[in-house]
Each structure stands twice: as C-alpha cells, then as structure tokens.
Amino acid sequence: MSLKKRYRETIQPKLQKDLSLTNIHEVPKVVKVTVNRGLGEAAANAKSLEASVNELAQITGQKVVVTRAKKAIAAFKIRQGMPIGCAVTLRGDRMYAFLERLINLALPRIRDFRGVSPKSFDGRGNYTLGVREQIIFPEISFDKIDAIRGMDITIVTTARSDEEGRALLREMGMPFQSN
C-alpha cells in the first residue's frame, strides 16, 4: 500500500483519535518536502554544480532549481548571482513517493543508523534532517559519483506543534531514536 493511501485510510483516522481532534481536516498532514544542497567550496566548479543538479534530479525525479547568491560576500569569495547550491520542492504524489523511499530504503542504508534525531523540529511541526552522503539513495550508483555530498531534507507539515508533527511522522514510519 502506498504511503498516500496508508495516510488516508489508517494514519489520518488514528491521529484524529489520538490527538482528540473533532474535524478530519484538523489532522496534520505533510504539505511539501524540500531537498536542498549547498555547494560550499565547490560553487566555483561548474562540473560539481552539474553533478549535484543531476544527482538531485535522479533522487527526486523532478527538475532542480539552481540557487544563486543574493549579494556578494568577499569573505566567502562569492559574487552576486553566483550559483551556490541547488534545491527541489516536492508536493503531491512525488512527495509521498520520495518520503516512502526515504523512510523505507534510504535511511536504513546509513552506516551505524540508530534512528533520526527527535529534536530536529522547528517549533511549528516541521522536521529537517541532514544526510551526509548521497549514496544511501538507491538511484545513485557508487561508481558514477565524483564526490560524497550531503543534503538537507525539510518536511513541512500542517502540524501546530512539534508533538503533532512527531506523531504524524512516527505514524508514517519515520525511525526516531529512542533515548
């Protein structure tokens, strides 16, 4: 059963009961997933930017937006308009497919994985996790990568508090660390 179908049929009613909500539309849901990668030192290298864009496109199955510097910062050796990273925003079916792959395939492939930190919520029910290496995703083949690069994954929810967001992600199967 797909994650979207499971959310509608089992997770939503269970959360409504657990959080004692009167209306089904009050139940927290995932709005979007943003996958972001800052290039850092590699920003000057066009080849690493292209490799980054291609990897994110393979992982998410969607076109990648190159993020550019808003203003020049001499200390970081960047000029205005220089490419400094890339990002993808996933919504709808692609978002649920990505979350399912992340939870069931990618996270268990992390070395010495004991669960994701339950403290990475922002106070409004949104969750951010950092991934250190892109090879945990099955779409990326180890032989074709030129460098190990990480990424930030932000899961934006309609939850009003961290507890609601944590309950939603736990029901979806997110493996949180047990203290």
UniProtKB/Swiss-Prot annotation:
Task: Indicate whether RNA-binding appears among the record's keywords.
Answer: yes
Q: Which InterPro entries does this UniProt record tie to the protein?
A: Ribosomal_uL5, Ribosomal_uL5_bac-type, Ribosomal_uL5_C, Ribosomal_uL5_CS, Ribosomal_uL5_dom_sf, Ribosomal_uL5_N
| Protein keywords | Ribonucleoprotein, Ribosomal protein, RNA-binding, rRNA-binding, tRNA-binding
| Record GO biological process | translation
Q: What GO cellular component entries does it have?
A: ribonucleoprotein complex; ribosome
TM ranges: none
The keyword NAD appears for this protein = no
Please give the Gene Ontology molecular function terms for this protein: rRNA binding; structural constituent of ribosome; tRNA binding
What family is this protein classified in? Belongs to the universal ribosomal protein uL5 family.
- Which HAMAP family is this protein grouped with? Ribosomal_uL5_B (MF_01333_B)
Function, as annotated: This is one of the proteins that bind and probably mediate the attachment of the 5S RNA into the large ribosomal subunit, where it forms part of the central protuberance. In the 70S ribosome it contacts protein S13 of the 30S subunit (bridge B1b), connecting the 2 subunits; this bridge is implicated in subunit movement. Contacts the P site tRNA; the 5S rRNA and some of its associated proteins might help stabilize positioning of ribosome-bound tRNAs.
State the oligomer form and interacting partners. Answer: Part of the 50S ribosomal subunit; part of the 5S rRNA/L5/L18/L25 subcomplex. Contacts the 5S rRNA and the P site tRNA. Forms a bridge to the 30S subunit in the 70S ribosome.
Name of this chain's protein = Large ribosomal subunit protein uL5
Q: Which organism is it from?
A: Parasynechococcus marenigrum (strain WH8102)
Tell me the gene name. Answer: rplE
